[in-house]
Amino acid sequence: MAIQLSNQRYEEIKCIVVRMFVAYGVSCVPINGFEIAHKMGVKVMPYSAYSSNIRWLLIKKSEDGFSIEKTNGQWYIFYNDEKDYGRVNHTIMHEIGHIVLDHSEDSELAEKEVKFFAKYALAPPVLIHKLKLDNPES
């Protein structure tokens, strides 16, 4: 059976996204995951920065990207820069979601939460409605 988030949890995540936008001065679209990560002090590393042997291991861990926290508390997001910009930006925001939502382990619940976090952060329904956007090209 698929995990379902409660309405309360959806609302909590929406509030977390809004607080993040306020904290990091996000006030225009398109939402840039790289900029938010930079403002958070997260180091963002493309797979292409590594040798082919290491890159193979990174892709084996995740086709799109992943985040890790070093013992000193520094967060890193590694991402596959061979993907298109939209996919990369979504991956960065997805990983920011894991960091902001304080996910300490992979789980179906954590993935459900972070998928909603990234979707809401990159395309907030209120903003889409206010700007009268009705298709992806808008």
What annotation goes with each model-predicted range?
Residues 1-138:
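Active-site hotspot residues in diverse enzymes, especially metal/ion-binding acidic/histidine motifs
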